């Protein structure tokens, strides 16, 4: 039965659960690799001496105090029962061998294709639990199933999200917290592009690109930071990471591509500002600025890919075919190839592994864009 005090304080018993689960994970699933699964069913198995039961309380801080005291007393419960909210099953897994990514809970938006799919694949290979979030749920489910098949059941989960819609973003993060107990890494990757000059660009397209590439990063950070803050409060050894997949167009303006470049420039401003705000919670915020991923659908889609869009928009002087556009862009890269998901994943791994950089925009462009 839901307790009215939780509804008054947290909006709902489920909202309270989303605030409690990260604390339970931080205190009792030590080492960073553990999970906590929530169920609204309040009953805890009879005779389970390891279960921690918290009765009627005045609010969330009293629950936090009870959890903290139990941890200080050496309790290691397999389940935590909070009256009026539900039960939290604790799975305190040992850290997997490898990098700091091993055993962490990672969220990749736009994870069903392109860079996002490749990033999800690399994170899973590094031992992370990966939430593949995308507007296209069916495609996200295919990616998650492939990751489970490659790395074992429970490696990945698919969830639907519209990153430009606040209600959808809040529901996504809450769903992750209730299923896994928290969140360690956000890779804000979802993005769109509409090429065109001043006369071709419509206000509708400009606002759409801005909503997905700029506003959505604010929304994702706002809600993803919440469980990270709670985890950091109760586990002094835990850090969180937020990584925006930006672009080389966030470092240098792009001809007849101002909607995209403007949002990416703004994204770096958000990265720097969020980094200053969240550092006290041990949350690092950085951006990766990849070069062009020519093999991905953003560029190669035969109907709406950038090669086609740029050809139609006349971005490449004298270009008559898609191959002409391709050759033009590859010639700009000193390493003579496009950026791959593996290149980006290595940069993400660096962001997570290192402990002294935040607010940075890291070029991964094959030498095309160099810091000045």
Q: PLM ranges: what are they?
A:
Residues 247:
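Residue(s) in the substrate-gating loop at a strand-loop-helix junction
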Residues 197-198, 205-207, 329:
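Substrate-binding pocket helix/loop in short-chain dehydrogenase/reductase
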Residues 226, 276-277:
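Alpha-helical segment proximal to the catalytic Tyr-Lys
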Residues 221, 263, 271:
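Active-site helix of classical SDR
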Residues 1-106, 118:
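Glycine-rich flexible loops
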